[in-house]
Each structure stands twice: as C-alpha cells, then as structure tokens.
Swiss-Prot record:
Residues 552-715 form the RUN domain. Belongs to the small G protein signaling modulator family. The modification Phosphoserine is found at residue 403. It comes from Bos taurus (Bovine). Keywords: Cell cycle, Coiled coil, Cytoplasm, Growth arrest, Phosphoprotein, SH3 domain. It is found in: Cytoplasm. Residues 412-435 form a coiled coil. SMART domains: RUN, SH3, TBC. It comes from the Eukaryota. This is Small G protein signaling modulator 3. Interacts with GJA1. Interaction with GJA1 induces its degradation. Interacts via its RUN domain with the C-terminal region of NF2. Interacts with RAB3A, RAB4A, RAB5A, RAB8A, RAB11A, RAP1A, RAP1B, RAP2A, RAP2B and PDCD6I. No interaction with RAB27A. GO terms for molecular function: GTPase activator activity; small GTPase binding. Disulfide bonds: none annotated.
Length: 747
C-alpha cells in the first residue's frame, strides 16, 4: 500500500485486513515513535482499545496469532488435495468448497492460520459458492438497498456506533469500518425483508469486517443466515434462537446433570444469559482470539458448535458454580464465564470430550420438537404461516427450485393447496376433536368411573414434559386381574365359578394350568385357559373399551376415530407422479418406525440407559415408545399380511394397539421427530411438517385417560372362527393332573 502506514509485526492493528488499517491512528503512532510521546490510547492487534495501566496485562499478550507449523500443515493439506498441476498453488486453483474429511476437521479444530482465514472461511462456510452463484452481485444489492428508507435503515443508523465502540474502526463516524458496516447491514435488510435488521447481525458483521473485505463479509453473513443457523434466528420474534435455548436446556439435562439440578434448585433461567451468546455466535462475548478459534469450527460445522462450546464453557466452570452460595452468585458466575476464558485449546478439548458425540441430526430433531412446543405455548398453532418453521430463510426475489428428479417423482407443489391449507387444517382438527369426544362420551356413559376425566386438551409446555414421566410411571402395586373367556360352573368348594366377561383377581399363578383367584369375596382355583390376563400396567380395565364386551366401541374407534386420524396423516402426503397415486400413510409409518428404532441397534450404552428409563413388558424387556411402535408395526404386518389385509386395515389395527398401550400421542411425536422421513414423504405445508402436529398430539393425549382392550385382529376374516377352538385344549390333561374328574369336559 504505497503512501500508507503499515502496522508493525504483531503490533496494533496488525491482525486486521489491510483495507481496515486506520491510517490516522497509525500516523500518530509513527509520530509518537519519533517524539517518544505516549499515545492517548493503546490498541491491540485487532484494533480494540486497551487502557494504559492494563496494557501489560492483556490476555494473550505475547502470544503469536499464527503458528508457523500449523500453517505448514494447512499448506501441505491444500497442496495434496487440490494441486494437481505442476507449479505453485494459488487460491484461484483451490475449489470454492473444500471436500469434507476427518483430516480437514482435525486441522480446523487445531485452528486456521490467521493469514489464511479470509480465503478458508469463505470456502468452509459455503459463502464463496454462494457469491459465485448469486444472480445479483453485492454491488447491485448495495445499489438497490441504498434508497430503501425503512424502519430497519433508521435503526441501523442508530446502532452503527453502538455495535463495537471499543474498536478504533467503529468508534467514530469517520471510522474506516462504519460505512462498510452500514452498507452490509442495509444490504442484508434489503435481501431478507422478513428479517430486516437485528442487533445480532450487526455484531457478527462488524467482527467479520475486521478480517474480510466488505463483499466477502456480506456473503459470509448470507451463509450464516441461510445455512449455518436455523431460520428465524434474527427475525423480530427471535423464534429460532429461543428454540435453541430450549434445546440447550435439554442438552444440559443430558450432559451436565449436576448443573441442571443446581439451576432447577435456584430457579435460574439460563437463557437470560446464553441467548446473547447464540444470537451473536459469541461475537463480543468472548475474547477475539478465542472467537476466531470458535468461528473456525463454526464455519465448518455450523450451529452444532454453539451447543458444544456452550456446554464446554459450563463444564469448565461447573465446580465453581456448584460451590456458589446463592442464586445471585450463580447468575453472576454464569454471566462472567465467557470473559474469563482464555485458553481456546482447553475449551475446545473439553467441549469435544463432553459433547463431541452430539450430532446435527440430534440437534435438529430437538429443534423441531421444542419449536412446536414453543409455538403451542404461545397459541400459534392453527393458522400459523408456512414460514413459522425453521427450515429456510426467504430471500427477496428468489425462490429455491426443486431438482428435476424430485419434480418428476413427486410433482410440483400444489399452490392452491398451500393457499387453502389453513382452512383445511382447521377442518381436520375439528373432525378429529369431534371423533375423540364421541369416544370419550361413550366411556363416560358406559362406565361411570370415567365421568370425572377432563376432556379439554392440555396445551401447556409442562404437559409435554409430563408425557414420558407418565409413560414410565406404570402402576405395579395392584394385583393382576383376568377376564373370563367362558362360563365356568362351580362344583366343589375349592373351585371358583364365573361367567363369561367376569373380572377375576388373580391370587396365584404358580401352576401353569390351574390358577387361584377371587371373585365376589370367594376364592378358588380355575382353569388358566379359561381367562385372559388383563394388561393393567398403566390403566384400570373398563368394559367400555373392550370390543369383546361392548361392540359399540369398535364402531367409534375403527369407524370414526381412525378415518379422522388417517385424514390428518394423508394431509400433504406427496403424490408420486410416476406411480399415478398417493402414497399411503402406512408406508411412511413403516419407514419412520424402522428409522427411529435403528438408532438404538448399534449402541450398547443406549440400551443400558433405556433399562433405567422406560417401562418393561411382561418378559422384562425394555420398551421405549419407539420400540413399542416398531414392534406394533411388525406385529400388524405379520398377522395382516397372512390375511392379505389392505393398508387401511393395518392402519386401523395399529391405532387400536396405540390406544391399548395409551401411547398414540407419543407415537405421533416419534413419527414427526423423524425429520428425514417426514421431509421425504410430506409437502412443506403438511400437518406433519408444521408445528401444528403438537396440537394433534395434545388432542390425542385425551384418549390415554381411557382404558382400551381392542383386538388387533378384529377385522381379519379368519379370526372369528378360530377364537373358540383353543380354549378347552389341554384342559382335560389339567383335570387329570389335579384329579378333578367330577367336571364334565364335554358339557
């Protein structure tokens, strides 16, 4: 740079991109060196002001910003993977995106050489690809936004000098970074009208401008908004970052249980502190040297790093937090954590040790779930716009097109359906609610003990937290009971007589053929094959829900409830154009159930955890809602395929199993949490891909208050004739064994 002042090596402003060097201040430095006068302020290599008395105590003082051996390792990697021609390797020969590999990740984790950050950040984040593919150049976007006098533009002007007041580049109106920051923020507000301006974007953009040229910083911001962070992160509602705070709280329960108990005990709302960390991606929260290391990884792996780094920070200070005496001390310690961290290697090592196994899929699943809970808590389910989800940020004048293969297989989106989706969704929910109420009224009319059941759905956040607790807390203290399948006449005093459908309390099952039971104050033995053990692990048997006793419940469930639920599952189901018809929800359920249960197959640890978590079946096998769904689907397939039953029949039978197990609402949550499967089978405007599924879950939860005993095979034709045959088989051997010849077997 001819005629300009250049910072000294490792001196003030030396880490900035050359176009950001503040020439006036550098000129004063040059004059002061000649006159041996002390300057008014001292600045570090990043341009941040340092008080004179603290100049010798600056964190990281004396440390080199770039490690020469690390730079050589990066050069060797780039040479090996990109230089296929003889000659020197230059940046224009390196692809716009770097192929992902464990080697590249290890290099990123160890740190990007500072002199390479502008070029590598653009490639790691996908910003360079975005810049090359854009129909509008940054210059054109700036031109379009320069005359855009909006509320956002006025707010940007107010915040320009507030964004980074301690940095020489942004401290004054004449600062070299101020006009750049203005143009970048106005361009972003113009390009993303649904976002406009958010103070979080200003903080991130200002930090990027310290190290990248203006247009590159803009495209980096586009990559952050569109790809690295979920949508609605910087919207006026801050819905995305609020959702991530709930996800973080869930992860703390999993990874830092001691800290979780402490926060609960002192009723501390962690999001009051950490929301700002996430909103600015740690910009202005941690020291700039530490920020650079975090951003190296953030631009490579995305928002997953925000969770890992936060968990790592909390873990490093966990012992100190546990020893805190009161809530105020805990809150202050939490607030001070970022400013007290200096060692990037220590933080990243702890973050990877603690949460290195955390995956983007797991985070996205939790995001979808907690977003739905958040919207349900705010009462924004019905009629919510399609953009409520966190799937995509919409640019001005741009629309993402489908690939040719996707369009050919599943057709184009039905625009009319998207326009009318709110009306359709309301009708579907109303039909389901009416079907549920009809079933509930049947129980209350048939069995008076159900009259006090609350039929109004609970939409609160706490209700979702209680779902799994209720599922786990099965009642085991009461005696087992059985339902009589046939009349059994009492001949001797030690026999227990009963009529068909009587409910018998089982006293002893020591003998496999003869059990001892009680009925109406009498105790005696009876043939075990003449009764059916009731599943009352989490419910008390009711004749109103037994289709063998009360046939009316079959019509209500299979004839009214199942069609209403099927209509919801069919809403937005993609229609394959090549096959000429809609896919059936049963196919989606099969795939989703298989995908969800596969996650446990390869993990011994997960099965050990499950043993402490969920209820057991009769054999002591652990059954999570996912495993229960998978088993039910397989069971229905085995029995129904043999009878050549249609998928409609299978779906109705599966719903009956879910009602029996009181998990129909949890199964819906399992299905909707299988993001890849849902996105494959359903349109973006469908119920299952919108937060509206949480309302359906709340409606279905009402049904778990009632005890169903529905036959899975009720619609199978051969079942009716076979039911009576096996009941008396083996009874004669049992009577011989117990010398009870007085009973007429053939009677």
């Amino acid at each position: 740079m001819s005629g300009s002042h250049v910072p000294s090596a490792n001196g003030p402003f030396s880490a900035l991109t050359p176009s950001m060097w503040p020439q006036e201040i550098l000129a004063k430095y040059a004059q002061e060196e000649a006159t041996v006068e002390q300057p008014e302020f001292r600045y570090d290599e990043f341009g941040f002001r340092v008080d004179k008395e603290d100049a010798d105590g600056i964190p990281y003082s004396g440390q080199l910003l770039e490690d020469p051996p690390q730079r050589l390792r990066w050069q060797a990697h780039l040479e090996f993977t990109h230089n296929h021609d003889v000659g020197d390797l230059t940046w224009d020969k390196i692809a716009v995106s770097l192929p992902r590999s464990e080697k590249l990740r290890s290099l990123v984790l160890a740190g990007v050489p500072h002199s390479m950050r502008p070029q590598l950040w653009m490639r790691l984040s996908g910003a360079l690809q975005k810049k090359r593919n854009s129909e509008l150049s940054y210059r054109e976007i700036v031109k379009n936004s320069s005359n855009d006098e909006t509320i956002a533009a006025k707010q940007i002007e107010k915040d320009l000098l507030r964004t980074m007041p301690s940095n020489a580049c942004f401290a004054h109106v004449s600062g070299v970074g101020v006009p750049r920051l203005r143009r970048v923020l106005r361009a972003l507000a113009w390009l993303y009208p649904e976002i406009g301006y958010c103070q979080g974007t200003g903080m991130v953009a200002a930090c990027l401008l310290l190290f990248l040229e203006e247009d590159d910083a803009f495209w980096m911001m586009c990559a952050i908004i569109e790809d690295l962070l979920p949508a609605s992160y910087f919207s006026t509602t801050l819905l995305g970052v609020q959702t991530d705070q709930r996800v973080l709280r869930h992860l703390i329960v999993q990874y830092l249980p001691r800290l979780d108990r402490l926060l609960q005990e002192h009723d501390i709302e962690l999001s009051l502190i950490t929301l700002h960390w996430f909103l600015t991606a740690f910009a202005s929260v941690v020291h700039i040297r530490l920020l650079l290391r975090l951003w190296d990884l953030f631009f490579y792996e995305g928002s997953l790093v925000l969770f890992q780094a936060t968990l790592g920070m909390l873990r490093l200070k966990e012992d100190e937090l546990i020893q805190s005496e009161n809530s105020a001390s805990i809150f202050n310690t939490l607030s001070d954590i970022p400013s007290q961290l200096e060692d990037a290697d220590l933080l990243l090592a702890e973050a990877m040790r603690l949460a290195g196994s955390l995956t983007a899929v797991a985070v996205e699943t939790q995001r979808r779930k907690h977003l739905a809970y958040l919207l349900a808590d705010q009462g924004q389910l019905l009629g919510a716009p399609a953009t409520t989800g966190l799937s995509q940020v919409v640019r001005r004048r741009t629309q993402r097109r489908k690939s040719g293969i996707t369009s050919l297989l599943f057709g184009e989106d039905d625009l009319e359906a998207m326009k009318a989706k709110n009306i359709k969704q309301t009708e579907l929910v109303a039909d389901l609610r009416e079907a549920i109420l009809r079933v509930a009224r049947h129980f209350q009319c048939t069995d008076p003990k159900n009259c006090n059941v609350e039929l109004t759905p609970d939409y609160s956040m706490e209700s979702h937290q209680r779902d799994h607790e209720s599922y786990v807390a099965c009642s085991r203290g009461h005696p087992r009971r059985a339902k009589a399948l046939l009349d059994f006449e009492r001949h001797d005093d030690d026999e227990l007589g009963f009529r068909k459908n009587d409910i018998i309390t089982i006293v002893s099952q020591k003998d496999e053929h003869c059990w001892v039971g009680e009925l109406n104050g009498l105790r005696g033995w009876f043939p075990a094959k003449f009764v059916e053990v009731l599943d009352e692990r989490s419910k008390e048997y009711s004749i109103a829900g037994d289709d063998a006793v009360t046939e009316g419940v079959t019509d209500l469930v299979r004839g009214t409830l199942c069609p209403a639920l099927k209509a919801l599952l069919e809403h937005g189901l993609k229609k394959p154009s090549l096959l000429g018809g809609a896919c059936h929800p049963w196919l989606f359920i099969e795939e989703a159930a298989g995908r969800e249960v596969e996650r446990d197959f390869d993990s011994v640890y997960s099965r050990l955890v499950l043993c402490k978590t969920y209820r057991l079946d009769e054999d002591g096998k652990v059954l999570t809602p996912e495993e229960l769904l998978y088993r039910a689907v397989q069971s229905v397939n085995v029995t129904h395929d043999a009878a050549h039953a249609q998928m409609d029949v299978k779906l109705r039978s599966l719903i009956c199993v879910g009602l029996n197990e009181q998990v129909l609402h949890l199964w819906l949550e399992v299905l909707c949490s299988s993001l890849p499967t849902v996105e494959k089978w359903y349109q973006p405007w469908s119920f299952l891909r919108s937060p509206g599924w949480v309302q359906i879950k709340c409606e279905l939860r009402v049904l778990c208050c009632f005890a169903f005993s529905l036959s899975q095979d009720w619609e199978l034709p051969a079942k009716r004739e076979e039911e009576k045959k096996p009941l008396k088989e083996g009874v004669q051997d049992m009577l011989v064994k117990h010398h009870l010849f007085s009973w007429d077997i053939d009677g």
